[in-house]
């Protein structure tokens, strides 16, 4: 059985030391992406995450999940999929500060947006974390609906962008 006191101390140390460093890094990346033009922010963050992502503990989890979902992939195909995942995730992060402008710039089109027109009693829109998942609510906003989001807060409570 794991040492409960050790786990509590480790969790406390992470909150005191690691979380503030992580929050600072995230806010710095957000600030950099915000001042860069949208295409540059997307490309730079995509390249950065493609480089750094495979060195994180999350890469192992992604590989295990990929093995469960697609066991037929060989090692080269797995590397290709995982590299694409990190690049896409970085691009999403790079685009995040610009999301509110992306629709207005004509870069985004919503397939099936007309299905939202005329709804009078509200609706649930459920989206997966595929592509830039932050854009989903703009489909409803674009046809004049109010939007409320239900989500799980970040584990890193120091960040509320």
Place the predicted regions along the sequence by residue.
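Short internal beta-strands
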Residues: 149-153
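Membrane-anchoring hydrophobic helices of lipid-metabolizing enzymes
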Residues: 2-127, 132
């Amino acid at each position: 059985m794991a040492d409960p006191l050790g786990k509590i101390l480790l969790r406390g140390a992470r909150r005191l030391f690691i979380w503030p460093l992580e929050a600072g890094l995230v806010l710095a990346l957000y600030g950099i992406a915000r001042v860069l033009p949208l295409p540059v922010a997307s490309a730079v963050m995509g390249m950065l995450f493609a480089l750094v992502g495979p060195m994180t503990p999350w890469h192992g989890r992604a590989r295990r999940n990929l093995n469960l979902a697609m066991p037929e992939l060989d090692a080269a195909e797995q590397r290709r999929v995982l590299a694409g995942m990190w690049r896409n995730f970085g691009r999403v992060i790079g685009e995040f500060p610009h999301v509110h402008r992306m629709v207005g710039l004509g870069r985004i089109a919503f397939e099936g947006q007309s299905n939202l027109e005329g709804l009078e009693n509200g609706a649930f829109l459920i989206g997966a974390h595929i592509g830039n998942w932050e854009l989903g609510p703009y489909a409803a906003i674009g046809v004049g609906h109010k939007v409320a989001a239900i989500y799980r807060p970040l584990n890193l409570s120091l960040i509320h962008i």
